[in-house]
Structure formats: C-alpha cells, structure tokens
Regions:
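Juxtamembrane membrane-interface segments at transmembrane alpha-helix termini
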Residues: 59-66, 93, 117-124, 141-150
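Ordered, amphipathic secondary-structure segments that act as subunit-interaction surfaces
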Residues: 75-112
Length: 192
C-alpha cells in the first residue's frame, strides 16, 4: 500500500482506520511533548499525548454519531468544545514570575495546537495533521533559535527593579536621562 492509499484508508470509517488515527494522535502528541519535556516544562510528553488522543477521540465520536444516528448533528460543535476546554488547560500553564516575566505561553500554544492536530486526525485529515506537525516542530526548534538571535541583537532590555521609596524612582529616571538612556515604557506597583 502506497502513501496515497494509506491516507485514503485512514479517511475511511473502519476499525483499522480508527486504530491508525489514534496511533497517529499518539505519535503527534509524543513528538510535541518530547520538545516540551526536554525544555523541562510542566506539560510534557504525557500531557500533550493525552490532549491529542482525547481530541482525536472527540472527533471520532462526532463522526460516529453523525454516521450512526438519524438527525442533523453538527460534528464541529464537539471540536469547538475541545478547543474551549484546552484554553482553560493552557491558562494553567501560564504564570507571571516574581520578576514580572511571563512563562508558559509556548506550552499553552503547544497544547492548543496539539488539540487541533488531534481533531484533524480524528476526522481523518491525516495529511494535514502530519504536515502541521512538521511545521510545529520547525517552529519549536528552529524559530526558538531565531527568536534568541533577535533578542540577543535587540538594543532594548527589560529591567525589573525594586525601590524602597518613590524618591529613588525619580532619582533613577533622572540618572537614566543624564546618561542619555531612553526609557520607552515603565510600570509602577506597590510591593506585596
């Protein structure tokens, strides 16, 4: 069986095709999860795999209901609920550190795209899922290096400074102006 034949087979509704869809979701979740695990993120292999498998099963369930029950059923509604639910899961991965750094955005986006990939696999759009998987891996691997280069060559920096009183803030700003350093943005808040 050639690749086109395999893709056509996976698009059918049979036990073998269902198994292939779920195994494809497992592979996709593991591949994305490995990248996050290597970077020691909270959502790693197991989380990404479960999200991808679960969303695949939801889409398979939608297709099953559509194929086997009389009535008008919009199978996209189940997928929409998966995306909504994964949004809540993703929020749990995003934190703001004590130094006002936002962490976990890539993990949240990875969980979201993993759910989308699972939905694509579940409905039988295997070729789209694997093409997207390749692009996701390129994004996580290659673009992180590009992002690092952009940050390293940026002329701006982010500073997090704690002052004991407002007078010191004014002194700091005055000193920056004397040194001809431009402050493009700043935020003040009371310490906890």
């Amino acid at each position: 069986m050639n690749l086109i034949g395999l893709i056509d087979y996976v698009g059918e509704w049979s036990t073998g095709a269902i198994v292939l869809r779920l195994v494809s979701a497992l592979i996709i979740g593991v591949v994305i999860g490995i990248d996050r695990g290597i970077k020691r993120r909270g959502a790693g292999i197991k989380t990404h795999t479960l999200v991808c498998l679960g969303s695949t099963l939801v889409m398979l369930t939608g297709q099953y209901v559509y194929n086997n029950f009389v009535g008008n059923m919009d199978i996209s509604r189940l997928g929409a609920q998966v995306i909504s639910g994964v949004g809540f899961l993703g929020v749990g991965t995003i934190i703001v550190t004590g130094r006002n750094q936002v962490r976990g955005l890539t993990t949240a986006a990875g969980l979201w795209v993993c759910a989308c990939l699972g939905l694509a696999v579940g409905i039988g759009f295997i070729e789209g899922a694997f093409i997207t998987l390749v692009l996701v891996i390129i994004t996580l691997k290659l673009l992180s290096k590009v992002d690092e280069q952009v940050r390293n060559h940026s002329k701006g920096i982010d500073l997090y400074i704690e002052f004991e009183n407002n007078k010191n803030v004014t002194l700091f700003i005055d000193e920056m102006r004397k040194q001809d350093i431009r402050i493009s943005d700043f935020e003040l808040g009371k310490s906890k």
